[in-house]
């Protein structure tokens, strides 16, 4: 049994409780405020319906004939082959360039000229402007090489030696 404290002794640790009445109760098994068990003790619950409606007609399973399986596999192979050919010929049409700006030769022009950088242009913009039918990345690399540029940053009005064509 736990001792009972006097009713008017202040408790500095718990100021939210009532000031009148006992602070300690006897150690008795406290009754739970939880509701009682709602399930039977020994047997699992049985669900009578799942809530999913199903038609009352017979649902016999028919095996898929091997001809259907082979036919679908051949159809999938034909579609895969067709997509591969489209990708291959599409790459041949664009010349294999990532940006699609390459001509049939895919070469950087040999002729050089002095060009001036315009407002808002990057190195790649200049490359597209001076050699629109050549691979942009290769033209930009050639401009960088000809002018000794370490970065692709350009200043407005800067003059560059560039391949044109």
Swiss-Prot record:
GO molecular function: hydrolase activity
Complex formation: Interacts with the cell division proteins FtsI and FtsQ.
Record keywords, A-Z: Cell membrane, Cell wall biogenesis/degradation, Hydrolase, Membrane, Transmembrane, Transmembrane helix
Record's bilayer topology term: Single-pass membrane protein
EC number, UniProt record: 3.4.-.-
Function description: Cell wall hydrolase that modulates cell division process. Probably acts by modulating FtsZ ring assembly. Murein hydrolase activity is targeted to sites of nascent peptidoglycan (PG) synthesis. Overproduction compromises midcell localization of FtsZ rings, but has no effect on the intracellular levels of FtsZ.
TM stretches of this protein: 70-90
Gene Ontology cellular component annotations, sorted alphabetically: plasma membrane
Main EC class the enzyme belongs to: hydrolase
Effects seen without this gene: Mutants have stable FtsZ rings. Deletion mutant is more sensitive to DNA damage. Deletion of the gene causes a 10% increase in average cell length. Loss of the gene does not influence the growth of M.tuberculosis in mice lungs and spleen.
Ranges annotated as biased composition (Low complexity): 29-44
Native species: Mycobacterium tuberculosis (strain ATCC 25618 / H37Rv)
UniProt-annotated stretches for the region LysM-type: 116-163
Keyword Transcription: no
Pfam families in alphabetical order: LysM
The protein's name: Cell wall hydrolase ChiZ
């Amino acid at each position: 049994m736990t001792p009972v404290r006097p009713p008017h002794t202040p408790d500095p640790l718990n100021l939210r409780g009532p000031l009148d009445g006992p602070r300690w109760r006897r150690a008795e098994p406290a009754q739970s405020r939880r509701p009682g068990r709602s399930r039977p003790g020994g047997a699992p619950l049985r669900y009578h319906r799942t809530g999913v409606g199903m038609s009352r007609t017979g649902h016999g399973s028919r095996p898929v004939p091997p001809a259907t399986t082979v036919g679908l596999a051949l159809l999938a192979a034909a579609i895969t082959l067709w997509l591969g050919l489209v990708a291959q010929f599409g790459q041949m049409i664009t010349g294999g360039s990532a940006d699609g700006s390459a001509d049939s030769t895919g070469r950087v022009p040999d002729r050089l000229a002095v060009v001036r950088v315009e407002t808002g242009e990057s190195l790649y913009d200049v490359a597209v402007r001076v050699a629109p039918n050549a691979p942009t990345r290769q033209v930009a690399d050639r401009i960088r090489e000809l002018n000794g540029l370490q970065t692709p940053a350009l200043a407005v009005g800067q003059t560059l030696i560039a391949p044109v064509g």
